[in-house]
A protein has these predicted regions:
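Beta-strand/loop nucleic-acid-binding surfaces
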Residues: 34-51
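SH3/SH3-like beta-barrel fold
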Residues: 27-31
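Short, flexible, surface-exposed loop segments at domain boundaries
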Residues: 1-26, 47-91
Length: 91
């Protein structure tokens, strides 16, 4: 798998709600400058299988080569999500 097309977004989970199908969730993340929605599916890798919760600081990666709907706030398919502790960074 080529990771060079992956983009990282760091922010805090504001809400988690059911997605369009039984096996997806929509996570709204507030970054320093905007809100971003991520679709989390069974194909999304969550590091250490951490249970995602509201208020949790995360880094989410999405593939910029995949199509994304032209909506606001932006909505991406999350490929990988990891939780972050205070002042922790990931590259």
């Amino acid at each position: 798998m080529v990771y060079s097309s992956y983009q990282k977004i760091i922010g805090t989970i504001q809400s988690i709600r059911s997605g369009n199908s039984c096996c997806t969730q929509m996570i709204s993340v507030r970054t320093e400058s905007e809100m971003v929605d991520f679709v989390v599916s069974q194909d999304t890798e969550v590091i250490d299988n951490v249970r995602l919760r509201r208020g949790m600081r995360i880094a989410a990666f999405y593939d910029t080569n995949l199509p994304a709907p032209a909506v606001f706030p932006p909505q991406y398919q999350a490929e990988l999500i990891t939780s972050l502790r205070r002042n922790q960074e990931v590259t």
